[in-house]
Structure formats: structure tokens, C-alpha cells
From Swiss-Prot:
Organism: Drosophila melanogaster
Localization of this protein: Mitochondrion inner membrane
Name recorded for this polypeptide: Mitoferrin
Database matches in PANTHER family: MITOFERRIN-1-RELATED (PTHR45758), MITOFERRIN-2 (PTHR45758:SF20)
Cited function: Mitochondrial iron transporter that mediates iron uptake. Probably required for heme synthesis of hemoproteins and Fe-S cluster assembly.
Family that this chain belongs to: Belongs to the mitochondrial carrier (TC 2.A.29) family.
Mitochondrion listed as a keyword: yes
């Protein structure tokens, strides 16, 4: 399949978006999971980590708890990342297609689409985050995902899996709106034709992840505290904020910022580049049909994927059309038209068929005019 055909393919097919999103989500979390474990350990208050960077934290985990400690709990992420990211990207693309019909403001479109995608994604990923972070904690007693789920449910009930859901939404709504807006911004600047361009997808994804992660780190610290506590004594964002401030001061809200940014940059780069690749690849398998994300109905092949148009772009097109019409009108009035030319030819032809008379025949050949020599011999 030609790369130039990428944006004319059925890029909003629900099946394509869900499949590409699931693969991208699993690959992202599997590759970056060890660094995510380091981030969780640096943000944890039990035991408190002081003046520890990424390298020293990772070294301590491996030395004290074994080589496989940084990847414990990865299976929970794999189980949750697939369906969560599948619905995440499908909801984003579907909402973006729908809102484009009602607004021409691009950033508003991205914000609304990102918010809807986040609500659906977090409803699925919140329980897996709790399991993952419990297994990432220092001296965690859990050796498997199943034992972790059973123990949490037995001791704390089902609500423990959604204890930080509100905080997670408060964190992820601004995170994802910044994420999607930044990604689409760099796409519009670096990839004007919106074609399949792996370097641009990776660069835009990395920039989006870095910006979103840096801004929302304090909320991530609060979420980590709520997810990792076993007693459930700390309830809500306000109480968690007070506890963090009391134990670590103002800087406690920014613990693990470097690890979070370094995690998010490659993670989002991997996620977006993988998603765009599989969307590009899977579209090529059914390039002649376009299935709407909203209705699911098949339509003829989509001519082009066009971003929501702004008022400035529409005004420019209108001015161009008006200029073309003006030039056409001026040409018709200033130069002989094909109609006038054909009329002149018709008139000349009629003159050639009329009988000879006093009127001069413009088509009379010079041989028809007799010379004096010829007139002398005429009878």
C-alpha cells in the first residue's frame, strides 16, 4: 500500500481503531513497566525515599528484592491495557468525528474527545492500577495477580479497586486533554498533509507525553498514595494532600517528576507510533470501504481525511473562488469568445455561397479575375 493513500483509507473504522489501540497499549506498558515501577517506588511514602534518583532506586530494588522485582505485576497491566486502550482510541476517534460536525475549533474538538476517551479508559484501568501498584510496593507480599486480587477484595472490599478513581479522573482529564492537544498541534505543524509519518508520530507523541506528565505530577503523587495504602484511612484528595505535605513538604508533590517524564516520553511515543502503524497497516487490508465510527455503516472509499476547518481557511477558499469568477467574467467581456468566432466563420461561409453580384466576394480567387489578355480573346 502506498503511504500517500494513508489518509484516504478507512481510518475511522471502529475495528481498526480498537485493534490498533489494544496493540499499542499493551506494547507501551510492557516496554516501559520497569521504569513505571521505579516511579511508583519514588512516589511512595512507605518507606519514604530520600534523595534517591532513578538509577539508585532501580539498583536498590534489584539488590534487595531480586532481579525480577521491577517487572512484578506486569501481567495485570497486560490484561488491563488491551481493552482499556482499545476503547480509549476508538472513543477518541469516534468523538472527534462526531464533534467535527458541530464545531470548527480544533482544540475544543481535541479536548472533548480526550475527555470522553479518558472517562471510558479509567473505568477499566483503575482496578489494574491498584493491583499493579500494590505489587510494585516495597516488600509486597503478593507473588501473583490472583493472590493480590483475592487479598484486596477480602480485606477491603470491591470499593478498594476504585478508591482512587475520582483522583485518577481529576488527574487524567487534564493529562489527556494536554496530551491530545499537544499531539495534534505537533501533527498539524510537522505533518501538514496528515500522512503516515513515523518520525513525526514519535516526536509528537514524546512531546505530548512530556508536557502532560510534567504538569500533572502532583496529582499522580496523590493517586499513588490512595492506591497503595492498605488500611484505607486516607480518604479523598484533600486528606491525601495534607498527609503528603505533612510527611514530605511541598516538594513531596513533585517526587518522581523526572521518572514520570522519562517514562511518559517514550511510552507515548511508542503508543502513538504503534497505533498509527497498525492503523495504517490494517486499513490496507480493507482499503475500499469506509466504516463510520458512529453508525458502523459501510460507505464508498473515503476521499480524504480532513481536519475540522477553521473560519480563516473557509474565508481563504471563498476569496479564491470569487477571484476565479472575476477573472472568468473579465475574459468573457474583453476577448472574442468562441461563440463570436464561430459566428464570424459562419458569416464568411455564407458569403462564399451567394451568387455573384455587385458585392465584392471576399473569397474570390485572383484567378477568377480575367486579365486584359484573356478579355481580348473572349467572345
Amino acid at each position: 500500500m502506498n503511504i500517500d493513500d494513508y489518509e484516504s483509507l478507512p481510518t475511522t473504522s471502529v475495528g481498526v481503531n480498537m485493534t490498533a489501540g489494544a496493540i499499542a497499549g499493551v506494547l507501551e506498558h510492557v516496554v516501559m513497566y520497569p521504569l513505571d515501577s521505579v516511579k511508583t517506588r519514588m512516589q511512595s511514602l512507605s518507606p519514604p525515599t530520600k534523595n534517591m534518583n532513578i538509577v539508585s532506586t532501580l539498583r536498590t530494588m534489584i539488590t534487595r528484592e531480586g532481579l525480577l522485582r521491577p517487572i512484578r505485576g506486569a501481567s495485570a497491566v497486560v490484561l488491563g491495557a488491551g481493552p482499556a486502550h482499545s476503547l480509549y482510541f476508538a472513543a477518541y476517534e469516534m468523538t472527534k468525528e462526531l464533534t467535527a460536525k458541530f464545531t470548527s475549533v480544533r482544540n475544543l474538538n481535541y479536548v472533548i474527545s480526550g475527555a470522553v476517551a479518558t472517562l471510558i479508559h479509567d473505568a477499566i484501568s483503575s482496578p489494574t492500577d491498584v493491583i499493579k501498584q500494590r505489587m510494585q510496593m516495597y516488600n509486597s507480599p503478593y507473588t501473583s495477580v490472583v493472590s493480590c486480587v483475592r487479598d484486596i477484595y477480602k480485606r477491603e472490599g470491591f470499593k478498594a479497586f476504585y478508591r482512587a478513581y475520582g483522583t485518577q479522573l481529576v488527574m487524567n482529564l487534564p493529562y489527556q486533554t494536554i496530551h491530545f492537544t499537544t499531539y495534534e498541534f505537533f501533527q498539524n505543524k510537522m505533518n501538514l498533509e496528515r500522512k503516515y509519518n513515523p518520525p513525526v508520530h514519535m516526536a509528537a507523541g514524546a512531546a505530548a507525553g512530556a508536557c502532560a506528565a510534567a504538569v500533572t505530577t502532583p496529582l499522580d503523587v496523590i493517586k499513588t498514595l490512595l492506591n497503595t495504602q492498605e488500611t484505607g484511612l486516607t480518604r479523598g484528595m484533600i486528606e491525601a494532600s495534607r498527609k503528603i505535605y505533612h510527611m514530605a513538604g511541598p516538594l513531596g508533590f513533585f517526587r518522581g517528576t523526572t521518572a514520570r517524564v522519562l517514562y511518559s516520553m517514550p511510552a507515548t511515543a511508542i503508543c502513538w507510533s504503534t497505533y498509527e502503524f497498525f492503523k495504517f497497516y490494517l486499513c490496507g487490508l480493507d482499503a475500499d470501504q469506509y466504516k463510520s465510527s458512529i453508525t458502523g455503516s459501510s460507505e464508498p472509499r473515503k476521499a480524504d481525511y480532513v481536519l475540522p476547518r477553521t473560519t480563516d481557511e473557509e474565508q481563504i477558499d471563498q476569496e479564491r473562488e470569487a477571484a476565479k469568477e472575476k477573472d472568468t467574467t473579465a475574459t468573457l467581456h474583453s476577448a472574442p469568445t468562441s461563440v463570436n468566432a464561430s459566428g464570424a466563420i459562419k458569416t464568411v461561409c455564407e458569403l462564399s455561397t451567394r451568387p455573384a453580384g455587385p458585392t465584392i466576394n471576399l473569397h474570390t480567387r485572383h484567378t477568377d479575375v480575367k486579365s486584359p489578355y484573356e478579355r481580348g480573346f473572349s467572345t
